[in-house]
Amino acid sequence: DDLQEIDFIISLGGDGTLLDAVTFVGDKEIPILGINYGRLGFLASIVRDEIHSAIKALVKRTFMIDKRSLVHLDANMPLFKGICYGLNEFTIHKKDTSPMIKIHTYLNGEFLNTYWADGLIVATPTGSTGYSLSCNGPVVFPDSASFVITPVSPHNLNIRPLVVPDDSVISFEVEGRTDGFLCTLDSRR
């Protein structure tokens, strides 16, 4: 509710700082300008010598907005301090030396698959070039309205990444010999 009067947010840092800003904006559709003062500037793409022109474009409202899909998480346990939006991906992953886990996956209430794997990634198009890509997921255009479901080290050779519409409700039940799994949202645990 405190964000209702905000026209835009300026993020000073790297991509990690911009991802933190996204968690506070959530689904409020407030534009974020990422100025790169950090190490990685894929998302925070404005470099120091472009700051003046970027601020000028904000003031004159002559900027373009890239719309990006977000992943939103609802869980039956408290996660991420109640800040459940991510720009890159959501993951379920086994902990440390825990054995492989079974992830029963449902798409819009219908059973999709049970993944026997080290984990599962649900990536947005923005996140498709990160962790999901390193697990053989496809690169998806940023403006495509989709999510990528990518298994991490699956036990079955026939299991491949799957692209689904971003308005899908994806549900999971995790089963393992122990409670040795964790969830992440844009690298937050």
Functional labels for PLM-detected ranges:
Residues D15-T17, L40, T126-T129:
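Short glycine-rich anion-binding loops that position phosphate/pyrophosphate groups of nucleotides
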Residues D1-D27, F63:
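N-terminal glycine-/serine-/threonine-rich phosphate-binding loop
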Residues V59, F141-A145, I149-P154, V163-G176:
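Structural signature of FAD isoalloxazine-binding scaffolds in flavoprotein oxidoreductases
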Residues E29-P31:
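Proline-centered loop/turn at the N-terminus of a beta-strand
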Residues T105, G127, C183:
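Short aromatic-centered micro-motifs
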Residues T114-A117, V122-N158:
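Gly/Ser/Thr-rich active-site loops/lids in small-molecule metabolic enzymes
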Residues F42-D118:
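Catalytic core of DAGKc-family lipid kinases
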Residues L79, I92, T97, N108-F111, ...:
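ATP/nucleoside-binding phosphotransfer catalytic cores, i.e., glycine-rich phosphate-binding loops
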